[in-house]
Amino acid sequence: MITTCLFLVACSKPASNNRMNQNQDVIALHFGEQGIQDFAKNSNTLVDRQPAGMNFLSLDWTPPKLGRVRVFSEKSNLEIENVISVLGTQVARRSNDGIQIMDIDASLHSNEYTTSQEAYTAYTKLVHQINDKQWKQYFLPFSARIDKQDNLKHMTETMGEVIDLTYILSFKEWQDVLSKTNRLVFNLYNGDVELGISLRRTYKDDKKEQYMVRYSFENFKYAGRNAISDSDKMNSEQLKQAFETEVANNKKARKTEENNMKKEGYHIDESYIDPDIWPYVK
């Protein structure tokens, strides 16, 4: 069986100018123009300009010495430990918008392997931080708003997708869910940023386990405009109209999805209201 192991992959890479100082403090990373400056300050590697219109900026660490970063949204932040790599994305045609996407690969634990109990402790620490820093549950605008009472049912039936951020699994529940899914998935937002977290168990035997975490941050300005075809060619009035059409279409799709989920025994959280992303899109 092939096991995903970013520790081993990273260790096999040749040394590069982009390897980070292993003893540095937490690196602050922002979106927008400040984000470009953050990457430039902490990396000697040139921007990777791709023909498809995306510019990539990266930071890397060599295990076993891993990094720490703090990613800032408009209103909060998230601190990430045991970081292996950070990839920041700038849209070339909208270069003045700066960094719009950040993908971060990290280990859940500081050593290459850990125990189930230690991994569980690290999971609870992550969930506490999510709540303490007021990240909120995010449903994609076309997806069903599943009620919190169906959290465990939803996790086991959808490969670990969490819908109640305030609920911390017991150790037994943690073991039971992972035995069925091998992962947990969080969909969050805070201010101008949406965040997907995928926590995966990548190895397990009788003595040790390994967990990797992917943090995918996306600015709502990019996400909103990217959902609209040719948004860059529109004036402000056309963009507003296209955005409203997109919202209406999403509502129709959501209604259909929620009706389907009700047939499967799920409850819908009618109180959930989508974040207003228009101020960021326009």
List PLM regions with ranges.
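Bacterial signal peptide processing site
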Residues: 12-15
